[in-house]
Amino acid sequence: MRLPSPLVVALAALTLGGVPSAAAQTMEPMSYSNAPIGLNFLIAGYSHQWGNVLADPSLPVRDVEASVDAGNLAYSRIIDVWGQSGSLAMVVPYAWLSASGEVFEQARSTSRTGLADTSMRLSVNLYGAPALSLQEFAKYQQDTIVGVSLFVTAPTGQYDPNRLINIGTNRWSLKPELGVSKALGAWTLEAAAGVTFYTDNDAFAGNGVRRQDPLYSVQAHAIYNLNPTLWAALDGTYYTGGRTTVNGVIGDDLQRNSRWGGTLAYSIDRLNSLKLYYSSGLAARTGTDFQIVGLAWQHRWGLGL
């Protein structure tokens, strides 16, 4: 049985994260869609990021140019939540980072390799996406879906307090999000708004304490189903807030940044899908003006597929 196009790689955007700045700015088309209860997904992804990836005005580092290659492994399962569909997902990324810039006006370069922070997500569709069996799902037609998600990022990534640049963040983050998806013939329009809260990093650049205000974000997607096995999306996001305080000193790093990108997803067969994505900075007040390109493979199983 070949599943409808909206399900193709709908969860692969989970593998976008590789470094903190990128993880905070990911764009995820098809995040709020329906799928049969009991399906499992294994996702393997690779991404390459380059540019001002590691911008952090609270560090004595300027003119940073970096490249990050990240491999990601994710698992997700579709679940029944009080008669509505939902999903549980977990992503473990591994990153290879190289960077150059000026530290206290001296040219420096460095490289890092190791685990990045692990992410988890719970999503629940509140309206328009009932819990369905595989047979029931074959007759399902999307109209309007309203859902919520909770993203949690754990400080499992490589972190050395004596280094200015790290792969991990040494803090937790929590992001609740509200999303809406509307099907209009071959088109699907999707929008989501969320806010990310951060715990303190109490081992910042030695024994310093770094705090960060909440980061508010909105994203929108225009998705077009080219045929039953292929869809494409135009993606955009805007985020603001996130000002930092280091050892009581408030930073001049309020974010008002935007990004745009595109996504192409293809269903190879009833069990395997591929997704290609790209995004770039559109306007950046405090740096983080980088580009990212990635490829994700998704395998699904369960329900006798």
Kindly label every feature range from the protein language model.
Residues 20-43, 128-144, 302-305:
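Outer-membrane beta-barrel biogenesis signature
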Residues 38, 65-72, 113-120, 144, ...:
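Residues that define the transmembrane beta-barrel architecture of outer-membrane proteins
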Residues 44-46, 73-77, 120-126, 150, ...:
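Residues on the lipid-exposed face of transmembrane beta-strands in outer-membrane beta-barrel proteins
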Residues 46-52, 92-98, 126, 152-158, ...:
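Transmembrane beta-strands of outer-membrane beta-barrel pores
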Residues 49-70, 107-108, 161-165:
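Surface-exposed strand-loop-strand hairpins of Gram-negative outer-membrane beta-barrel proteins
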Residues 52-53, 83-86, 130, 186-189, ...:
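Repeated loop/turn-to-beta-strand initiation elements of outer-membrane beta-barrel proteins
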Residues 205-305:
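Outer membrane beta-barrel transmembrane domains
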